[in-house]
């Protein structure tokens, strides 16, 4: 049976990692073979030879109020940041009509953990009920990001551990290819939290030195960050002058 599948193109990207917080600097860091895996001051308090690719630079979102930022966990804040960067690159951030039709799919693994870390780490005085209310749910980042970015085309959460982000991209692709949406924002976001690091450490799967692609090392290096891409139906992108 003949099917009329739509063509799908990528029109915007955003990135946040231990190497950079924008696409151009990230690309240059990769070309220069920079290594973002370092000794972790955060986890060295708990574990020996603690190494990770951590996001250490400050996240700059001047368009958000301090009150809003305080209510978001890193999973939501990072997802918002890379999502907005992708919309800016796509030329859609100031297009209300386009945002009204755009859906959001977010891939996560341990979202909702941060608000309760003070309880895990015996820092009861740092526990915030407001943050727990806004960011304590597993899918809280979806509602936060869609609201802050003005996306009204529906939201979905993918929680399939290490495959969450590519699954989010695949689902967004399917929505467009099958004519269910003309544009989608796919986001992956994952901070490293103490329970996650402790779990991999207890399994003895982390290598004491930095891993690299095809290095053949008998272990892994854990990292954190976020990424986003805007996917559009080809004719939709051409009609609005996307490049």
Which residue stretches match the model-derived regions?
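Conserved "HGTGT" condensation-loop signature of ketosynthase/thiolase-family condensing enzymes
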Residues: 1-153, 177, 193, 201-221, ...
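Catalytic metal-binding/acid-base residues of hydrolase active sites
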Residues: 190
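Active-site histidine-anchored catalytic micro-motif
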Residues: 168
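Short, high-confidence coil segments that cap the C-terminus of an alpha-helix
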Residues: 181-182
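Short loop-beta-helix segment that forms the pyridoxal 5′-phosphate
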Residues: 154-159
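Short conserved active-site loop signatures built around small residues
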Residues: 165
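Internal active-site segments that recognize and position negatively charged phosphoryl groups
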Residues: 171
């Amino acid at each position: 049976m003949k099917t009329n599948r739509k063509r799908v193109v990528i029109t915007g990207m955003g990135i946040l990692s231990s190497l950079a917080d924008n696409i151009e600097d990230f690309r240059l860091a990769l070309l220069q073979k920079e290594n973002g895996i370092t000794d972790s001051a955060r986890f060295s308090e708990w574990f020996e030879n603690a190494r990770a690719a951590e996001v250490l630079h400050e996240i700059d979102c001047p368009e958000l109020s301090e009150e809003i930022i305080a209510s978001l966990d890193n999973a939501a804040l990072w997802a918002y940041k890379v999502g907005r960067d992708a919309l800016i690159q796509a030329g859609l951030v100031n297009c209300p009509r386009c945002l009204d039709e755009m859906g959001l799919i977010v891939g996560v693994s341990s979202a909702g953990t941060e608000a309760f870390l003070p309880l895990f780490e015996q820092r009861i005085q740092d526990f915030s009920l407001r943050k727990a209310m806004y960011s304590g749910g597993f899918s809280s980042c979806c509602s936060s990001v869609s609201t802050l970015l003005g996306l009204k085309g529906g939201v979905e959460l993918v929680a399939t551990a290490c495959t969450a982000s590519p699954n989010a991209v695949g689902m967004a692709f399917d929505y467009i290819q099958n004519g269910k949406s003309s544009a989608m924002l796919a986001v992956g976001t994952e901070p490293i939290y103490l329970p996650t690091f402790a779990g991999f450490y207890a399994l003895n799967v982390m290598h004491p030195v930095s891993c690299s692609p095809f290095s053949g090392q008998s272990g892994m290096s854990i990292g954190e960050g976020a990424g986003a891409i805007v996917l559009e139906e080809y004719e939709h992108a051409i009609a609005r002058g996307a490049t």
